[in-house]
């Protein structure tokens, strides 16, 4: 499953913070302080922007394989209305985020899905059921150490999963008609991390079980830049639940129906053959996973990034796979390779801007460039880069990204002597920051990290 790394990488070109470094909520770190309301506004997902022929290939690759590479012989889905039950101690923002997600699935994917009434007992519900259970992270990782959140078929709660964790009952490749699934989410992490888990895991409970690094426009991608279900994802789910498809179909049977379905549901994607990405070697995927992993330290991660870039160039790619390889190589490069890293980062941004959904990745690169500009006292450049990135961060509802950009921008304003504007921007960003980083202590740590860069720039300017 996803959540290998945090959505935001550590500031600067030299490192990328893994998810394990995101501060968790606890009583000593302000977890009991009410979180200001973060309001992302009306959902405005990035649209499906690729030719239908490409998305047909993506559907088949996502739908007929597991993340591990194991094949899935038969198409599977729920038949009929799906209901969602919540159990455990759901954090304050989680249920509102769940309701927002379910409304999007109804409106954008056309799926009949809704919450069970709070008083209803999941065990008494005879229909299709997805249970979302909130648990302490420690309890989850004692059983599944590598997963931050995940979804399991044919169980209704944690005890049911633990009792059957070595049983073929929970083997997704054996499921044809889905009737029950349980999503397990840590209750003691940030609101944004919880929201992101809900989007991907419920998306997988309903639809595809695979992730593809080359899909820059999808949450079904372990690079973690898309944090909520995109237009591509919603279109895929709408096709997934079209009446022309039925559980038990083979890959060839589904493939025969997909072009007509996509052309009907996405008329603007008609008539273009699109690009054929070719096979992505498993060795490249493993190298990317190593570069993104929190295990093994910086040296091992850097080696993974270098190997991924070498493999991408050997393959002759000029798509999001090369862009991701360049980006990770730049972020993990040692300080004495700063010039080469900058060139790689700029090349990655150019490739991402030419890729559907890649504007999100390019906006993250703008943030990294803004940090470098701030360190050099180039306040005008900081304001230009952050202004370009902020609409994408807001549109994709990435609160941590929004807050980080605002804090960087505030330091640039302070460099220009616009202290009142800087203070107002920091204050206005607190709701997004608390949602994205979780606790007051975590917000303060991020603000202080950026403030130190701004302070150093002011000291240099005073010399």
Task: Locate each region found by the language model.
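Metalloprotease/metallohydrolase-associated module, dominated by Zn2+-dependent proteases
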Residues: 18-26, 67-69, 156-181, 185-193, ...
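Metzincin-family zinc-dependent endopeptidase catalytic domain
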Residues: 96-199, 204-205, 209-215, 323, ...
